[in-house]
């Protein structure tokens, strides 16, 4: 016997969260809980404003229609990426095919003060990997901050993300302030420039490896080995079903590229599932999941070690 519930939720964000020049005051999304006999599976559907093609209102309509079809015996996945991902997670939990083992080691995220990151990294066991958002301030400032971090922590490897913010000139201004001897410790810089060709040129001219992120979701993208390209960053909420995520990871690994499972600022429930997906598909790579502290609460499932208050499912708005 099948049953299902759908919940709508909204989490207040910290004041300083800006996405694509837009302040994100709340994180809005949906949960689906599928039950069959004694088993149940959960999934999160939370399109990311400014990045997802769909709004959460669009996602809600598609999800409710899919749930009704599933209750009637139809299991075909929806095409909308955020819904396909959430539903496929719920189905995988229901079928017990999503492993429980999780990689909760997140690369800490630096949005502002480099001193905060230095303190975080001092207590980090093992390989020191951190992520720094660049492109929000002047490129020269970004270069100086990155250089400072690499100089202060000799065993640090940095992942940088520019979200296509730079012109070729700004990319050169950034690189000018990063010591040549430190550049090999930049694990990769995600999408430095507005076009892929400009990003490729940046990698050739600076010796700084790049990674594809937004490019993966463009219709003309193909997985090929290219000089200067070291990694792909896979955001499942923006990608689609678990099968599609796995296909992309396998395509990257076949070319010798690093595949990084990365957050789209999901709630704690979604983040714990991403940690399980990372342990399953990319066991040797620290995922990019250090976004929970951008929120003011956890929901339904706790992230280990987080001190944020937990909102129980009973406090959420039930739609079905």
From Swiss-Prot:
Enzyme class name: lyase
Entry keywords, A to Z: Lyase, Magnesium, Menaquinone biosynthesis, Metal-binding
Reported cofactor(s): a divalent metal cation
Keyword Phosphoprotein: no
Residues at the catalytic site: 133, 235
SMART domains: MR_MLE
Pathway(s) of this molecule: Quinol/quinone metabolism; 1,4-dihydroxy-2-naphthoate biosynthesis; 1,4-dihydroxy-2-naphthoate from chorismate: step 4/7; Quinol/quinone metabolism; menaquinone biosynthesis
GO molecular function: magnesium ion binding; O-succinylbenzoate synthase activity
HAMAP family found in the cross-reference section: MenC_1 (MF_00470)
UniProt cross-references to PANTHER family, sorted A to Z: O-SUCCINYLBENZOATE SYNTHASE (PTHR48073:SF2), O-SUCCINYLBENZOATE SYNTHASE-RELATED (PTHR48073)
Protein name per Swiss-Prot or TrEMBL: o-succinylbenzoate synthase
Originating species: Escherichia coli O127:H6 (strain E2348/69 / EPEC)
């Amino acid at each position: 016997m099948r049953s299902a519930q759908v919940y709508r939720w909204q989490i207040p964000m910290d004041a300083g969260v800006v996405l694509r020049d837009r302040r994100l005051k709340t994180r809005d999304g949906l949960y689906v809980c599928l039950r069959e006999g004694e088993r149940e599976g959960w999934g999160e559907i939370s399109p990311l404003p400014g990045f997802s093609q769909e709004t959460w209102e669009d996602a809600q309509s598609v999800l409710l229609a899919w749930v009704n079809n599933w209750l009637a015996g139809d299991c075909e996945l929806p095409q909308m990426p955020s819904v396909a991902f959430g539903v496929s997670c719920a189905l995988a939990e229901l079928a017990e095919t999503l492993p429980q083992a999780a990689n909760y080691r997140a690369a800490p995220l630096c949005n502002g003060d480099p001193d905060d990151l230095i303190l975080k990294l001092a207590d980090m066991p093992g390989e020191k990997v951190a992520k720094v958002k660049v492109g929000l301030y002047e490129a020269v400032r970004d270069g100086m901050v990155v250089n400072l971090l690499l100089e202060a922590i000799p065993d640090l490897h940095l992942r940088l993300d520019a979200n296509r913010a730079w012109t070729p000139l700004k990319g050169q201004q950034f690189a000018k302030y990063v010591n040549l001897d430190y550049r090999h410790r930049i694990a990769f810089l995600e999408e430095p420039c507005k076009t892929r060709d400009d990003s490729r040129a940046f990698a050739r001219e600076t010796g700084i490896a790049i990674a594809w992120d937004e490019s993966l979701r463009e219709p003309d993208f193909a997985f090929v080995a290219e000089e200067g390209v070291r990694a792909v960053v896979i955001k499942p909420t923006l990608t689609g079903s678990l099968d599609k995520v796995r296909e992309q990871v396998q395509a990257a690994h076949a070319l010798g590229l690093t595949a990084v499972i990365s957050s789209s600022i999901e709630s704690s429930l979604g983040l714990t599932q991403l940690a399980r997906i990372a342990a399953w598909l990319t066991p040797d790579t620290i995922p990019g999941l250090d976004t929970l502290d951008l929120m003011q609460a956890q929901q339904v499932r706790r992230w280990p070690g987080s001190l944020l208050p937990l909102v129980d499912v009973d406090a959420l708005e039930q739609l079905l």
